[in-house]
């Protein structure tokens, strides 16, 4: 479909409540909003129309963000902030009528410059006047860097006067307008309140969906914004103040100079770790030079400790921010004015200049990067999963001392950065998608989970057991490869279990691990370590027995943990029971997820073993044949079948409808896991903050750390699946989407639980391994209990309107489940009698 015909189709499809505006073509699209170009019938001006469907704002927090954005934009007017002209609402949609910025966002100037100078007359003229400093990177000319820094500073100064913190400063939210539209000389330009050079494109801050009124002394705790540009205190779930915006300004300034962000990583926590490890040293590529006073400013902004970070007054009065740029306005540039008017009259958005045959892409020889949406609220959505397993680039570099200037930046390694003919200079990957997505909203529950786990780690017992490790609050623990038993050969039981320090307990891990291997058809990738001695030793074979006994008692209505008063004596059994349920649900989700994104045979997996928060394994169980051989290396065998499929071929091997179904099922199961994990932390939190002594057992501490890690992992994988579903939905016919059947997580759990119990009964009748049968019955009971337990509903767990009150189980459904629970519990009792 041509751009023109597409625009006409859009105009017919969108109808605003009033007739003050006409809607033309779509210029940006994201998960929550579609941005159209339009025209105001009052004065004929071009406008941007941000259409947000109410149906996509299912989360209360997202609706609040939109309402906040509208409220803020109505109150603030500034030449370097995208203005809200009008707002219209219908029963199904919000329409924000905003200033139109025909040149897109700052990423077009940085990442698409090479393509645009060949196609866009105004941008070509700008870069002819102010050429880039080097062909080796995408950094901008110093004049452009300082000009846009000053305009950004002007907008931030205005926001500070209103006690506003933006919380999502990044190049994608810095829009560029064509210059010389309402003025033609420097005097008029500055009288209108603009800062910088009058004949250059004008920068304006957009997207106030995450902004908040926050005085200088106030602290916030919600994690939001885009991780690549987030301050470390936000990445680490700490409270933060308005100085978080200054960190983001530092990252933008660095990117304008070097053509890429200062830090990159595969997830939030790895990014935080890289920032912390840098120890306030900022490394730049060896092919990039930043003058000392700009580099000093970057270092002041990119200071890890917010207390030591440059303050707003110091920033606003910095010599670079206050530098006089009037000398660049002395000469008249007729080309800029004529080209600017041509662009305005052409009615073309910047991305339309980039549409061209694929054959020309190779001939261009420029940097190939992801297209970005360029208007406020248009989320970047790429289909980059197939690049997921490319080797990750080390962006830290090797620091080298500079002899020219003591304040000049250390030069970093150029590995993976310098270009050669026919090669791209940087590789995009799914990791970048996760980090660059437009909206990151982590509910307050996430902050609470991590905060509580840190409290336990800080205040809990260090160790009372020989060989146990101290539990630390940081979420970056890695497995040790040392063997605490010295030269003693591990026993058969120890060789069967390779259990990380975050497992609930050895006995419980054994039960749950076998359940995941034998019953869910999925074996978790094990760590590359062969030792199990550096974790706390909690060998208590009674735990699993107690858990199964409790399941039987609950089935006989002789026990209901939630009706008991929480105390020091029963808090651990409470949490153990919930951990068991969370693990079977998590394992079910992992089985589905492994079919969508198989684990690669290397450490470059997104869910890397180097990051415990994202590690898949709480335990790893060897195959019986391998175990009996006594070969410890057999632990490193990954799941056969699906996990051997390369990520590059997974989309082709699974038909799109089936892939989408798998994604939806896996997402629902991860969300259910999150609900159970949050429930256990809510319970623990209540006990912890009512406990004056703030003392807990080592076992409970380990459980809490395990729950925290699983919670964060499930959240990350749910985000990945949400984005993948969005990509799949975009590629499908709307008619097909309407015809898709609804998937109920309750039915998934119910069917799986009955399937497990049937297989266990068959195995028992065949005289199979009774231990396996016991595990299967227990797993089935835990899954069915999840369906019946009202305390594990999302409405009960999340107190902030996170979920709806919709449930797919009526009383007759519950009665049927109770009958199965009773039947399976009786089988389990009979089996235990046989075993004893």
From Swiss-Prot:
Misc remark: Kluyveromyces marxianus proteins are shorter in length and have a more ordered secondary structure than their S.cerevisiae counterparts, which might contribute to the superior thermotolerance and solubility. K.marxianus could be therefore useful as a new model organism for further elucidation of the molecular details of autophagy.
Polar residues bias: start-end ranges: 411-425, 459-468, 630-640
Similarity section: Belongs to the protein kinase superfamily. Ser/Thr protein kinase family. APG1/unc-51/ULK1 subfamily.
Primary gene name: ATG1
UniProt keywords, alphabetically: ATP-binding, Autophagy, Cytoplasm, Kinase, Membrane, Nucleotide-binding, Protein transport, Transferase, Transport
Summary of subunit composition and partner proteins: Homodimer. Dimerization requires the presence of ATG13. Forms a ternary complex with ATG13 and ATG17.
The species this protein was found in: Kluyveromyces marxianus (strain DMKU3-1042 / BCC 29191 / NBRC 104275)
Location relative to the cell: Cytoplasm; Preautophagosomal structure membrane
Major enzyme class: transferase
GO cellular component annotations of the record: autophagosome; cytosol; phagophore assembly site membrane
Protein name, per record: Serine/threonine-protein kinase ATG1
UniProt function note: Serine/threonine protein kinase involved in the cytoplasm to vacuole transport (Cvt) and found to be essential in autophagy, where it is required for the formation of autophagosomes. Involved in the clearance of protein aggregates which cannot be efficiently cleared by the proteasome. Required for selective autophagic degradation of the nucleus (nucleophagy) as well as for mitophagy which contributes to regulate mitochondrial quantity and quality by eliminating the mitochondria to a basal level to fulfill cellular energy requirements and preventing excess ROS production.
Region (Interaction with ATG13): 571-836
Binding site for ATP: 27-35, 50
Chain positions covered by the region annotation Disordered: 387-425, 458-489, 619-642
Catalytic activity: L-seryl-[protein] + ATP = O-phospho-L-seryl-[protein] + ADP + H(+); L-threonyl-[protein] + ATP = O-phospho-L-threonyl-[protein] + ADP + H(+)
GO molecular function: ATP binding; protein serine kinase activity; protein serine/threonine kinase activity
Record's bilayer topology term: Peripheral membrane protein
Domain remark text: The LIR motif is required for the interaction with ATG8 and for the association of ATG1 with autophagosomes.
Source superkingdom: Eukaryota
Null mutant phenotype: Still forms preautophagosomal structures (PAS) in proximity to the vacuolar membrane.
Active site positions, chain numbering: 168
Enzyme Commission code: 2.7.11.1
UniProt feature, compositional bias: Low complexity: 395-404
